[in-house]
């Protein structure tokens, strides 16, 4: 039984690529045809590629690997947060801060600062501080939470990246490649598939398409975790 069906992909509009004038020739092998100036993605290939990505993620998660979900475009923000939280993984759904991976120590300092402010609030220190100072701290906390909330529990570099639209997330992709972190990506007809280890050829602009594919990656993690729980129970 395949991980995803052709019907699901069609209903979510996964097959709609970009306009033919905005394409990357390297994506040619994933294109089925052209219709009304738009490339149509070969969904048989997508089914196969989703399966490959799913198996890789399941295997990784079964061995305790951590995945960072990355999608900062409007169409991806909600799905990335929801699905990463559902499978208890990390995410970046606002702006990617340069150095999130390659300058991890600095990012950790910012996370430490976020934790300090959270602790001050919990311990009631806000109640005794001047109002102006409290407003300033709350603003700082909001900003840090916005950009780092999805990775504040990420104590070390992730074992893989799941990226929606590698063209938009090119800084994240470049950092992962520099550190030899494998990348799974939803890759539309205007992207370069060579940058990605596990290419999922698909529409990266439709909310439903992004949600469907992101949920499959989360499912793979959850399947691995359920397998672990079952193994522990059997012992």
From Swiss-Prot:
GO terms for biological process: translation. The gene is rpsB. This is Small ribosomal subunit protein uS2. GO terms for molecular function: structural constituent of ribosome. PROSITE patterns: RIBOSOMAL_S2_1, RIBOSOMAL_S2_2. The keyword Cell cycle does not apply. InterPro entries: Ribosomal_uS2, Ribosomal_uS2_bac/mit/plastid, Ribosomal_uS2_CS, Ribosomal_uS2_flav_dom_sf. Belongs to the universal ribosomal protein uS2 family. The keyword Kinase does not apply. It comes from Geobacillus kaustophilus (strain HTA426).
């Amino acid at each position: 039984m395949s991980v995803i069906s052709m019907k699901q992909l069609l209903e979510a509009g996964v097959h709609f690529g970009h306009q033919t004038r905005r394409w990357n020739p390297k994506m040619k092998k994933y294109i089925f045809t052209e219709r009304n100036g738009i490339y149509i993605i070969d969904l048989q290939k997508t089914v196969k590629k989703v399966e490959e990505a799913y198996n890789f993620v399941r295997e990784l998660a079964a061995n305790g690997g951590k995945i960072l979900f990355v999608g900062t475009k409007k169409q991806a923000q909600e799905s990335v947060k929801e699905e990463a939280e559902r499978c208890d993984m990390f995410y970046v759904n606002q702006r990617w801060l340069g150095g999130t991976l390659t300058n991890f120590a600095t990012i950790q300092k910012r996370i430490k600062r976020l934790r300090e402010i959270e602790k001050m609030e919990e311990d009631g220190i806000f109640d005794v501080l001047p109002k102006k100072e409290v407003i300033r701290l709350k603003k700082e906390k909001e900003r840090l939470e916005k950009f780092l909330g999805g990775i504040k529990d990420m104590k070390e570099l992730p074992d893989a990246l799941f990226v929606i639209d590698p063209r938009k997330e090119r800084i994240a992709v470049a950092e992962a490649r520099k550190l030899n972190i494998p990348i799974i990506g939803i890759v539309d007809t205007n992207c370069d598939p060579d940058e990605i280890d596990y290419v999922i050829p698909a529409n990266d602009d439709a909310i439903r398409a992004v949600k469907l594919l992101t949920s499959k990656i989360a499912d793979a993690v959850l399947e691995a975790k359920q397998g672990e729980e079952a193994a522990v129970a059997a012992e």
